[in-house]
Amino acid sequence: MSNEKTSTKAPKFTYSSKKKFCVFCSEKIDYIDYKNVERLKRFMTEKGKIIPRRISGNCARHQRQLSTAIKRARYMALLPYVVK
């Protein structure tokens, strides 16, 4: 009798997605302005949440600036906190 165990797990499939890139780095934007509402809306969901970095493809530096700019725009009532 053999003590060998057979593997019953299915092989893991990996998928390769397109390499995401930072929009702000490619356009050489150093400062994200909170008054540019149209640009900020592109990085928000329909419900008004900030899209995370792993989905948007932003670098860490620009994602921090983006979230600060969105929060400032919300405080100044340029963007809504919640969309119903």
Swiss-Prot record:
Self-association and partners: Part of the 30S ribosomal subunit. Forms a tight heterodimer with protein bS6.
Gene3D superfamilies, per database record: Ribosomal protein S18 (4.10.640.10)
BP GO annotations: translation
InterPro entries: Ribosomal_bS18, Ribosomal_bS18_CS, Ribosomal_bS18_sf
Family: Belongs to the bacterial ribosomal protein bS18 family.
GO cellular component: cytosolic small ribosomal subunit
Biological source species: Dictyoglomus thermophilum (strain ATCC 35947 / DSM 3960 / H-6-12)
Organism superkingdom: Bacteria
NCBIfam families cross-referenced by the UniProt entry: S18
Name listed for the protein in its UniProt record: Small ribosomal subunit protein bS18
GO molecular function: small ribosomal subunit rRNA binding; structural constituent of ribosome
Record keywords, A-Z: Ribonucleoprotein, Ribosomal protein, RNA-binding, rRNA-binding
Role this protein plays: Binds as a heterodimer with protein bS6 to the central domain of the 16S rRNA, where it helps stabilize the platform of the 30S subunit.
